[in-house]
Amino acid sequence: MNGMMRGLFLLLGVCVLSGCKSVAPPTPLADLNAQQMHGHAVYQAHCAQCHYDRKNEALHGPALIGVFKKPYLPSGAPANDERATETIVHGRNLMPAMGNTLDQQDLDDLLAYLHSL
């Protein structure tokens, strides 16, 4: 029985640790390409007042660090460009819609920046 219990604890430990993935740190600002830099400027102008980009803490909205390095967005939706775009353009809960504020280039560049986080 002791051996079986040890085996179960070992299996449990392996299962727990396999779910603990570390997220790669954001790309340093100095290493961003031109599109990502413009996306950073869009973020600063329209997103920074509610979302941290390089700190894993909520401000008024969820932190955006590693947002595309996880399988799901903070809303629970799949972490992909389509779902993120839908949220940015149409808003969600407390987040205002940005569809009339951002043009397609701004949106594309913002997504490129979010992918660098």
Residue ranges and their predicted role:
Residues 20-42, 80:
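Electrostatic cytochrome c docking/interface patches
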Residues 49, 63-66:
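Soluble periplasmic/extracytoplasmic beta-strand elements of cell-envelope proteins
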